[in-house]
């Protein structure tokens, strides 16, 4: 049996699209919101089964990975987050790069030699890798208009994955993947009602975020706090990415209030120095990510000062 386990953001979805459009197989999909990354523990695979893992930190899935390997499961792992110690096992195939200008969709694009490059470009744009995505688009011969459309698609796909619960999303990531797979091409999906719904939601939420101002500013970083509202939870990721573009010399932390009074945190390193975000977030129990962009799934309110201290140590030194 085949299991496809993937992050519910643009990078994870576009990675799987490339693979399955080239190699269609019946599989069990395992995915969730963008921050739901410990997905391998949900996989009940048996000896001889095959599991494909896309855009999920190996650090957060190592115990489940070791369990699957010990059970005789074959695992293909492709990712761009911090991996830690990679198991040495004959059943494990690994393609991992932690380079800040790489995402999983681009790694898959390399493996497939550009066979589904449009989806790779959309995934990279969604992961806020505008320069690498644009370079791949130019090399592949896409027009400026088509490249702009792929960028908007990638951003909207990524936007859909944010929020602490599936109820906040416009589409369950598995259903969104299904709609994209059925469309086959980005251009076909861009003409669909599903994309119009996603696009309208994105534009409304971005408009609501435009009045926000930072609650804390230091020379090297700024902190923004979003209200406990569905639109804020959905827009937190793209809002963080927009801040990086608007203020490229400083880092940003975007806090979204949760129902229990804690915060969902997105941290973006300065665009001019795409390092340190993972270092900051990994100091907290539910934190992690990559050097350019990381997050904390649940930050207790009493740890806000600790977060500001970690940001100051990393970016004001």
Question: Which role does the model predict for each range below?
Answer:
Residues 58, 159-171, 192-204, 234-241:
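Short N-terminal helix-initiation segments at or just after the protein's N-terminus
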